[in-house]
Curated annotation (Swiss-Prot):
Source organism, top-level taxon: Eukaryota
Record-linked PANTHER family: SODIUM/POTASSIUM-TRANSPORTING ATPASE SUBUNIT GAMMA, SODIUM_POTASSIUM-TRANSPORTING ATPASE SUBUNIT GAMMA
Keyword Transmembrane: yes
The protein's name in its UniProt record: Sodium/potassium-transporting ATPase subunit gamma
GO CC annotations on file: membrane
Source organism: Xenopus laevis (African clawed frog)
Length: 61
């Protein structure tokens, strides 16, 4: 009986989570995703089609 309880406690220990590590990893991922998003927005490389519209207007003149 004691052996069965020891086996069950060892199996349950495999599935315990270290919530502090998970939280830190999530915060680091969120910070990196935020910085990458800001770099994309403020890079000036992607202008949502503004350049194409300006070229079309200049070609007509």
């Amino acid at each position: 009986m004691a052996d069965a309880q020891d086996d069950m406690s060892q199996m349950q220990d495999k599935f315990t989570y270290d919530y502090e590590t998970i939280r830190k990893g999530g915060l680091i991922f969120a910070a990196i995703a935020f910085v990458v998003g800001m770099l994309i927005i403020f890079s000036g490389r992607f202008r949502c089609g503004r350049k194409k519209q300006l070229r079309a207007l200049n070609d007509d003149m």
